[in-house]
């Protein structure tokens, strides 16, 4: 496959609202649209096609070895006037395969993502830890980018991001933004995060809390007066707290819970759901903000499970919300269908019963 043909494929994919493009030998390209993976009506790709795509993408990356030595590699790829793409190149059945995720040129706003005002207010925090959680492909990177944009447009600060790879490209507005990528700019999240503390940041974005060392340094950064933004692969606030605590030895758990209680300012847990129109996906989110009660739930491991109920009862007071509350709102406003809302709810039968009483 020639590079021009590949770029045309990417342009068509973006035009059709594709989130991911899959390429492998022996099958036609496939596009993930509204969460469904759909084959393109073209002939199956040959091994030389996927090899050619891997080759010209790698020529613009930091890969310096022989193509034949590559087994797995993360990089990015850009097409002018089309967009940027996060790219994973790998082998399957001895041949090259690729998955590319579309990253729009334009950085989203909190409003454009359909998130409530409380998310925008999180950008006003001067210190602490804010976490975006959800499964792969739940829109965490977009929400992080929207929060960074909000800070950038309203605050004179130094925002330092550590990403693998860099996704959204930010331009300096009121803030000064430094974007570092694992590989060409630094060797790991933990190394870059440790160095960041000597680079006079006000806000630090860490692409992912991958290991205990990164979590520890992020907590220290929050404790020393920085606002730290990051992601965790968990599905709600309670599970996020447990995941962070369990990353440490058992004897450290009580101390970590107290540190999280003092420094964890917010958790946004997301899912992407197909819209009722069949075009695009909507964000459904559980949102936790720090309160005295939340601090107690974090410290007491036997009460952490109470967080979800607390969030649903204090929406009008603190702007918090449970998943089911947001799902109900999305259904009533016609954004998603009842079947989609029920399937995504904590308990489908309870969810439908609750709707009947409203």
Model feature map: region roles:
Residues 1-358:
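Short, flexible helix-loop junctions that flank or precede catalytic/ligand sites
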